[in-house]
Amino acid sequence: MVKMIVGLGNPGSKYEKTKHNIGFMAIDNIVKNLDVTFTDDKNFKAQIGSTFINHEKVYFVKPTTFMNNSGIAVKALLTYYNIDITDLIVIYDDLDMEVSKLRLRSKGSAGGHNGIKSIIAHIGTQEFNRIKVGIGRPLKGMTVISHVMGQFNTEDNIAISLTLDRVVNAVKFYLQENDFEKTMQKFNG
């Protein structure tokens, strides 16, 4: 079996620490203690790293298509490596959840998230595993774009750091148990 863990975000240093890049941050945290080196693959339009965990090949992916076209990279990789949709997890930000809240789902709509809209459009289904990290709603008078492209304040940064640790633990648990339902039961909340 082959697994693929995708973190959504935008490429480039100017977006590196923005709320919208929580998926990239999660991938970086997951691979921190693994022997994974990323390569910038122009064919797949993604940064890709891989390793074996429990005798299974696991790909860690950060699409370089910019958020709104993430589905291009995800579809290309699923097809090329013949990865089953049930072996895909997508990690991304959710502004409809409080900062640092974590929610795991095995299906659902895009909920207004353009990266998820793109993935659904390209793979043709809403039924794929996802880990949503809350980034909160914009403050009064602030646009959604300026909110998601902004950085976390000091207080939220601490909370997000702890949440990213939970994301790492959830992904490790999933890779160990090979059961997303069980992972949802353990880590939702």
Curated annotation (Swiss-Prot):
An annotated GO cellular component: cytoplasm
The entry's keywords: Cytoplasm, Hydrolase, RNA-binding, tRNA-binding
Active-site residues, as the UniProt record annotates them: 20 (proton acceptor)
EC number per UniProt: 3.1.1.29
Pfam families: Pept_tRNA_hydro
Positions marked as site (Stabilizes the basic form of H active site to accept a proton): 93
PROSITE patterns: PEPT_TRNA_HYDROL_1, PEPT_TRNA_HYDROL_2
Subcellular location: Cytoplasm
Protein name: Peptidyl-tRNA hydrolase
Species for this entry: Streptococcus pyogenes serotype M5 (strain Manfredo)
Encoding gene per record: pth
